[in-house]
């Protein structure tokens, strides 16, 4: 009687692993990777909000694209595609500021973390929303995305 249950359990486990269902260790790893990504995005938002009014108003003229529906880690591809424009906007505003190194470090961290989190899937293409967002909205939405993913893993 127990053999049948054990065999069913083994078969189910193999089916889940074969279909790349997240395992407990991969969930823990993902959570560990999401934490620094979230912190880096929050740091950038803090830096943006610390600019003088003139610089912030200039930064708000640049527009960014958000995916129509970001609910899975694969949607981080959309963030990755907008990292270069984000870095250019932050560099423009930081031209004479000492925080430039910290921003570059955060951007590099975000790039590496997003690459690891989204995995090797290359066939995914982003479907962007028709409306663009400001740099503040962009960072806030990605922070919310990370928090949402993180909360589903706890």
Swiss-Prot record:
The keyword Secreted applies. GO terms for cellular component: extracellular space. It holds the Pfam family IL2. GO terms for biological process: adaptive immune response. The keyword Signal applies. One of its GO terms (molecular function) is cytokine activity. Residues 1-20 form the signal peptide. Keywords: Adaptive immunity, Cytokine, Disulfide bond, Glycoprotein, Growth factor, Immunity, Secreted, Signal. Disulfide bonds join 78-126. It is found in: Secreted. InterPro entries: 4_helix_cytokine-like_core, IL-2, IL-2_CS. Glycans are attached at residue 23. Cytokine produced by activated CD4-positive helper T-cells and to a lesser extend activated CD8-positive T-cells and natural killer (NK) cells that plays pivotal roles in the immune response and tolerance. Binds to a receptor complex composed of either the high-affinity trimeric IL-2R (IL2RA/CD25, IL2RB/CD122 and IL2RG/CD132) or the low-affinity dimeric IL-2R (IL2RB and IL2RG). Interaction with the receptor leads to oligomerization and conformation changes in the IL-2R subunits resulting in downstream signaling starting with phosphorylation of JAK1 and JAK3. Belongs to the IL-2 family. This is Interleukin-2. The gene is IL2.
């Amino acid at each position: 009687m127990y053999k049948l249950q054990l065999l069913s359990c083994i078969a189910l486990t193999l089916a889940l692993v074969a279909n790349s269902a997240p395992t407990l260790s991969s969930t823990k790893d993902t959570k560990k990777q999401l934490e620094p990504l979230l912190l880096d995005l929050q740091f950038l938002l803090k830096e943006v909000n610390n600019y003088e009014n003139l610089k912030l108003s200039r930064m708000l003229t640049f527009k960014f694209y958000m995916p129509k529906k970001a609910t899975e880690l694969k949607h981080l591809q959309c963030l990755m595609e907008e990292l270069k424009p984000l870095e250019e906007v932050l560099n423009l505003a930081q031209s004479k500021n000492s925080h430039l190194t910290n921003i570059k470090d955060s951007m590099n961290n975000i790039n590496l973390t997003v690459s690891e989190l989204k995995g090797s899937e290359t066939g995914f293409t982003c479907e962007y929303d028709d409306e663009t967002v400001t740099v503040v909205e962009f960072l806030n939405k990605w922070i919310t995305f990370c928090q949402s993913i993180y909360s589903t893993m706890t």
